[in-house]
Amino acid sequence: MGELGHRRTQTGVVVSDKMEKTVVVRVDRLVKHPLYNKYIKRSVKYKVHDEKNSCKAGDKVQIVECRPLSKDKRWALRQILESAA
């Protein structure tokens, strides 16, 4: 099989690494308020598959969309961009 097509990627910070092969990643984005034209920080947390348990809390990571791995996991770890330590 060839390339699976374009998959969405996100960049975020690991906030929890207490599960086996799973980390929680917070992805922040800026949204402009329609009336006041002020930018507001919004964030969403994703459960991300980490096969090697290599992430620690505070790491900056890149994640990629994948097939559903469990009830909540639809993202996988692509790479660690910055280590917290």
Curated annotation (Swiss-Prot):
Keywords: Ribonucleoprotein, Ribosomal protein, RNA-binding, rRNA-binding. GO terms for molecular function: rRNA binding; structural constituent of ribosome. GO terms for biological process: translation. PROSITE patterns: RIBOSOMAL_S17. CDD domains: Ribosomal_uS17. It holds the Pfam family Ribosomal_S17. Gene3D superfamilies: Nucleic acid-binding proteins. InterPro entries: NA-bd_OB-fold, Ribosomal_uS17, Ribosomal_uS17_bact/chlr, Ribosomal_uS17_CS. GO terms for cellular component: cytosolic small ribosomal subunit. One of the primary rRNA binding proteins, it binds specifically to the 5'-end of 16S ribosomal RNA. Belongs to the universal ribosomal protein uS17 family. PANTHER family: 40S RIBOSOMAL PROTEIN S11 FAMILY MEMBER, SMALL RIBOSOMAL SUBUNIT PROTEIN US17M. Part of the 30S ribosomal subunit. This is Small ribosomal subunit protein uS17.
